[in-house]
Amino acid sequence: MDMGLREMCVGEKRTVIIPPHLGYGEAGVDGEVPGSAVLVFDIELLELVAGLPEGYMFIWNGEVSPNLFEEIDKDGNGEVLLEEFSEYIHAQVASGKGKLAPGFDAELIVKNMFTNQDRNGDGKVTAEEFKLKDQEAKQDEL
């Protein structure tokens, strides 16, 4: 598929044919794709969305607040639950202050971000656990 989409322009329509050896092979997928199937895709490129740097699923567009944890912790109890975290990240994306990786499940990205911050796995993030990616890199250098 990658080869078939190379150098495609916005508004362009293209038929991509994938032979069995580049698709599902002789075996196919039981009950879904017959063996030795030739895959044919009619594609129209409607929009080209820039991705994120390698290794990132979320980026900030601009400066990050120095009081980020406090902003996420809406109820001020010193702990951020997944619901608070998710609402905050989605609000940042909606306002253009943040960007999630296009083409991926947004809820899954946010859940993974939260899980990465919840270092002790107790279902909540404290200020001590909370670190941005660049802060983690500095700590690793020590």
UniProtKB/Swiss-Prot annotation:
SMART domains: EFh. Residues 60-95, 105-140 form the EF-hand domain. The keyword Cytoplasm does not apply. Ca(2+) binds at D118, N120, D122, K124, E129. GO terms for cellular component: endoplasmic reticulum. GO terms for molecular function: calcium ion binding; peptidyl-prolyl cis-trans isomerase activity. The keyword Repeat applies. Residues 1-49 form the PPIase FKBP-type domain. Pfam families: EF-hand_5, FKBP_C. It comes from the Eukaryota. Keywords: Calcium, Metal-binding, Repeat. InterPro entries: EF-hand-dom_pair (IPR011992), EF_Hand_1_Ca_BS (IPR018247), EF_hand_dom (IPR002048), FKBP-like_isomerase (IPR051989), PPIase_dom_sf (IPR046357), PPIase_FKBP_dom (IPR001179). This is Putative FK506-binding protein 9-like protein. It comes from Homo sapiens. The lineage of its organism: Eukaryota, Metazoa, Chordata, Craniata, Vertebrata. The gene is FKBP9P1.
